[in-house]
């Protein structure tokens, strides 16, 4: 008996551990700054007014388009979702069996224990009903900015960017991560691009500390609202 209780306790601990969200950690290698693959050679000073390596096209701008360049992404995300679901199942069954004879004969239906004669008639009726309703609403708003680096430039000119920002506060840390693809034409003259122009965007806003813990339900509450709850 004690062994069975230990098995159930261990299984419950494993299930409850799966309900705990992982804590984000800084210095993720995937979001680390990407440096240029080939550093530019140092130009020799020949004493002339014109120095090779410092030239700039008259009609070009300072937009980021090389690996390792810096781009600022302005976050302006708003999402809302609502879902309603309802189900109702009802079933009624009834069966009546009436017999006056059995194999061509009428059996003796006298009750030897008293209280009236017995009967060959039988009946069954049953009702079953199940009803469920659910409703879920969610809304999120994320505004701000984050500066990332160019990780890769594809042959068609699409720029892959990614980066993260950690803010250390009195009661914990806040994390903003973003990764995605942008077009060079969407980069403004001040080297910024809105997050709504980022394709295949992966935006993460999370944190650690007392504020992050206060916004999360307890482990037992997460179990009751999880698919593991049988009712």
Swiss-Prot record:
Organism the protein comes from? Pseudomonas putida (strain ATCC 700007 / DSM 6899 / JCM 31910 / BCRC 17059 / LMG 24140 / F1)
Q: Where is the lipid attached (N-palmitoyl cysteine)?
A: 19
Instruction: Please report the name of this protein according to its UniProt entry.
Output: Flagellar L-ring protein
Provide the Gene Ontology terms for cellular component: bacterial-type flagellum basal body, distal rod, L ring; cell outer membrane
Q: Please give the superkingdom of this protein's source.
A: Bacteria
Keywords noted in UniProt? Bacterial flagellum, Cell outer membrane, Lipoprotein, Membrane, Palmitate, Signal
- One MF term from GO for this chain? cytoskeletal motor activity
Q: What is the residue range of the signal peptide feature? A: 1-18
């Amino acid at each position: 008996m004690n062994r069975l209780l230990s098995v159930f306790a261990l299984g419950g601990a494993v299930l409850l551990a799966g309900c705990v969200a992982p804590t984000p950690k800084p210095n993720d290698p995937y979001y680390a700054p990407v440096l240029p693959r080939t550093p530019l050679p140092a130009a020799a000073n020949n004493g002339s007014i014109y120095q090779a390596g410092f030239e700039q096209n008259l009609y070009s701008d300072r937009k980021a388009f090389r690996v390792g360049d810096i781009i600022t992404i302005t976050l302006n995300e708003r999402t809302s979702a609502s879902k309603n679901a309802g189900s109702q199942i009802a079933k009624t069954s009834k069966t009546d069996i009436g017999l006056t004879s059995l194999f061509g004969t009428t059996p003796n239906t006298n009750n030897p224990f008293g209280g009236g004669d017995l009967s060959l008639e039988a009946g069954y009726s049953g009702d079953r009903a199940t009803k469920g309703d659910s409703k879920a609403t969610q809304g999120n708003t994320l505004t701000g900015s984050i500066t990332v680096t160019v990780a890769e430039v594809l042959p068609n000119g699409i720029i892959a960017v990614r980066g993260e920002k950690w803010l250390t506060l009195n009661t914990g840390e806040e994390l903003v991560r973003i990764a995605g693809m942008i077009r060079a034409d969407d980069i403004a003259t001040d080297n910024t691009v809105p997050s709504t122009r980022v394709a295949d965007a992966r935006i993460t806003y999370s944190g650690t500390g007392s504020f992050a813990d206060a916004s999360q339900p307890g482990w037992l509450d997460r179990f009751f609202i999880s698919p593991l709850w049988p009712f």
